């Protein structure tokens, strides 16, 4: 089994897990819709992806979602796989963290993927097929210090996906919860600190983490196998 000939829409596709996933799916023959905020970086990824549409937009801009869905659907003839990957992490103690940081992380990591899924869902239901993948985190299963906002959002998106699966599974749709552990990306470098500024330095555990290409290979294999929960972490291999 593979994603050959299928249309996959990935948010946060300009780097890290999103970019690696795009390249891996393209290698299987999938057609890609690549979304994010950095158009130049998306175009660089698209060069490796064969048939690809670069569709930049801000996922928290609710007004931009409906036009993006329309464009993606019309270009592809129907989305077979939506990967809600765009996100932002946190590195700060709760006692020090501004409320605005909670608002920002919940907006990006929870409300934005819900909004995009809700906009696309009626089309998938009407067609009677499709996959929706939520990139949560190990921090969406276990409370991790210095990440209270991030944990809240990632637990939340996992709960949304679990409930959604119960609603649409009998309609031909599959919903996957993906829980990456330490994958070697810029996630910790781009994390927000207590005042909302970018951290700018990486965690050693992240730097020494699973290479993105290996992580996404597992994700793809387990999605094709129909796994509901996909844990991508050292020692979690099946």
Model-derived regions: residue spans:
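SDR active-site lid
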Residues: 166-233
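Active-site helix of classical SDR
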Residues: 117, 153
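Substrate-binding pocket helix/loop in short-chain dehydrogenase/reductase
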Residues: 93-94, 98-103
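Conserved glycine-rich cofactor-binding loop
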Residues: 7, 14-15
């Amino acid at each position: 089994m593979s994603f050959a000939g299928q249309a996959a829409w990935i948010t946060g596709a300009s780097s890290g897990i999103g970019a690696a996933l795009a390249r891996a799916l393209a290698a299987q023959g999938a057609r890609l819709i690549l979304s994010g905020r950095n158009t130049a970086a998306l175009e660089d990824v698209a060069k490796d992806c064969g048939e690809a549409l670069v569709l930049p937009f801000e996922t928290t801009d609710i007004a931009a979602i409906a036009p993006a869905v329309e464009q993606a659907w019309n270009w592809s003839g129907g989305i077979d796989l939506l990967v809600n990957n765009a996100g932002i992490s946190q590195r700060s103690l709760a006692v020090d963290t501004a409320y605005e940081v909670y608002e920002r992380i919940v907006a990006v990591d929870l409300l934005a993927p819900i909004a995009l899924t809700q906009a696309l869902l009626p089309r998938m239901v009407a067609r009677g097929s499709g996959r929706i993948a939520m990139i949560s985190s190990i921090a969406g299963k276990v409370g991790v210090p210095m990440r209270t906002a991030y944990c809240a959002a990632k637990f939340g998106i996992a709960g949304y996906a679990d409930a959604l699966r119960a609603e649409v599974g009998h309609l031909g749709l599959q919903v996957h919860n993906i829980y990456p552990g330490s994958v070697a990306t810029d996630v910790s470098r781009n994390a927000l600190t207590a005042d909302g500024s970018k951290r700018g330095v990486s965690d050693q555990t992240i730097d020494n983490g699973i290479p993105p290409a290996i992580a996404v290979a597992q994700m793809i294999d387990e999605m094709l196998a129909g796994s509901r929960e996909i844990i991508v972490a050292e020692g979690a291999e099946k």
